[in-house]
UniProtKB/Swiss-Prot annotation:
Subunit structure, interactors included: Component of the SMC5-SMC6 complex which consists at least of SMC5, SMC6, NSMCE2, NSMCE1, NSMCE4A or EID3 and NSMCE3.
UniProt-recorded name of the protein: E3 SUMO-protein ligase NSE2
Family: Belongs to the NSE2 family.
Signal sequence annotation: none
Keywords: Acetylation, Cell cycle, Cell division, Chromosome, DNA damage, DNA recombination, DNA repair, Isopeptide bond, Metal-binding, Mitosis, Nucleus, Phosphoprotein, Telomere, Transferase, Ubl conjugation, Ubl conjugation pathway, Zinc, Zinc-finger
Organism lineage: Eukaryota, Metazoa, Chordata, Craniata, Vertebrata
PTM summary: Sumoylated, possibly via autosumoylation.
Gene3D superfamilies, alphabetized: Zinc/RING finger domain, C3HC4 (zinc finger)
Amino acid sequence: MPGRSTSSSSSGSTGFISFSGVESALSSLKTFQSCISSGMDTASSVALDLVETQTEVSSEYSMDKAMVEFAMMDRELNHYLKAVQSTINHVKEERSEKIPDLKLLVEKKFLALQNKNSDADFQNNEKFVQFKQQLKELKKQYGLQSDREADITEGVDEDMIVTQSQTNFICPITQLEMKKPVKNKVCGHTYEEEAIVRMIESKHERKKKACCPKIGCSHVDMRMSDLIQDEALRRAIESHKKRRRQSN
C-alpha cells in the first residue's frame, strides 16, 4: 500500500507518494509467474506421458484443460502486473501533490486489458503453443491423430511414413540419431542440443552469424533463444529405440 513520505527526493517516491511497498509486492507477484510456468511444464509432461502409455482420462482431468487454465492465469497475472506498472509510471509522470486512488486506477487499467481478451491470446503463450505442437507430433508418432488428421494420411505408404519419421531422428550436424533434440522456434528444424549449441557459440565467438544447418533453410541468424527442448521428439526417439531392441 502506498504511504506518505516526508522527502520527495527519496528513491522510489514521487511527490508525497512512496511506491516502495507497491514495487516490493510487484516483485513478489512476478515470482508467482515461475510457479505458473512450472505448472505448465508438469501438465505438459503428464499429457505426453498419457499419450505415450495410451492412457485415457476423463475430460475433468484433461491436461489440455489444465494448460488452458494455466494460460488464462498467466494472461491475467500479466495484465495485472502491466496495469500496476502503468499506473505507477503515470502517477510518477504527473507528480501530483494530491494522492490518487491507486487501487481504482489499477482496477480500471486491468479491466480495460481484460476486456480485450480473446482465444488468440494463447498463441502468444510460448509454453501453450509448444505444448499443442508437441502433443500433436507425439500423437502422430503413435498413430493417435484425430479423424481429420487420419484422413489426410490415409492411403499414404506406411513404410514411407516410418522412413520419414526415422529421418527426422537424425541431427543435420552430427548425422547421428539424436539423444537430446532441441527445436528451432523460427524454422522448426531440430538438432542435437550439444551440437547446435557448440555451433552457435563457435560462430558468435568469431563475430559471425549462425545459419540453420538444415540444407535449404533460409534462417541465417540463429540465436540460443531460438532453441527449445523437443520433448515429443525425444520420447518418439526413445520409443523407436525400444521397439528396435525388442525386434532384435
